[in-house]
Amino acid sequence: MQVFQVKEVHSQADAVLEGATQHSVYHPDSLHQPQSDWLAEEVPVALVYNGISHVVMMASPKELEQFALGFSLSEGIIQSPADIYGIDVQNACNGIEVQIELSSRRFAGLKERRRSMDGRTGCGVCGVEQLAEIGKPVAPLPFTQTFSLSKLENALVRLRDVQKIGQVTGCTHAASWIAPDGTLSGGSEDVGRHVALDKLLGARAKQGWQQGAALVSSRASYEMVQKSAMCGVEILFAVSAATSLAVDVAQRCNLTLVGFCRPGQATIYTHPQRLSE
């Protein structure tokens, strides 16, 4: 993993930016004069469980321990962080390998249901053996909280702060955890929206955040709803729209799904009883 020294990043002097690289670009008014710009890095990341490669994802090369934990939880590979004995991030010849040591019980379960998913890039259909596995049932979520929509405004304003790479490249998605008082407990960014969410879910499990809601800078696909529900997230806010399958899954698993989140604006798709003004 490389850390790049940035002399000037859109008025940020002497900044340090991980997950971006410089490249020569041209603009219409200076086609013969190259200029330096910053691009978000995208690398293959292999998740390897007890020595067996399970999945390869395209991702930003940062916060990969959080990603491994979040992915393991959101895919039902583990039930709690205690099921993982160790995580080791290693550079490989063509990307990065994340070596994950699972408990014997969880690894046995993974081998039983293991499916061919090589090359998956966040698509929930890729590598699934049968169409019946799409939108698989998730245990219904309990109703344990009420969240004030007035607290969403501050979170939307602060979401950009999570995207350090995105601010200089325009090329990342963000996922943040909103505490009940509207402050951001933490957040993650990645070139892939599903990976950004998995990183957040990993951070949430590690930090023990319970009450509150997840906020993503992208649309809400069914897989993002399913991942959230698998991790016990009761409320998911998305800056863009939700798909019809995402709404169906959210309805079935009792997740409150809200899209088109802007200051003073929101579209509530499911279970509005968790929300207040």
From Swiss-Prot:
Main location: cytoplasm
Assigned keywords, A-Z: Cytoplasm, Molybdenum cofactor biosynthesis
Annotated TM spans: none
Assigned GO CC terms: cytoplasm
Active site (catalytic residues): C123 (cysteine persulfide intermediate)
Family as reported in the entry's similarity comment: Belongs to the FdhD family.
Function, as annotated: Required for formate dehydrogenase (FDH) activity. Acts as a sulfur carrier protein that transfers sulfur from IscS to the molybdenum cofactor prior to its insertion into FDH.
UniProt protein name: Sulfur carrier protein FdhD
Organism of this sequence: Pectobacterium atrosepticum (strain SCRI 1043 / ATCC BAA-672)
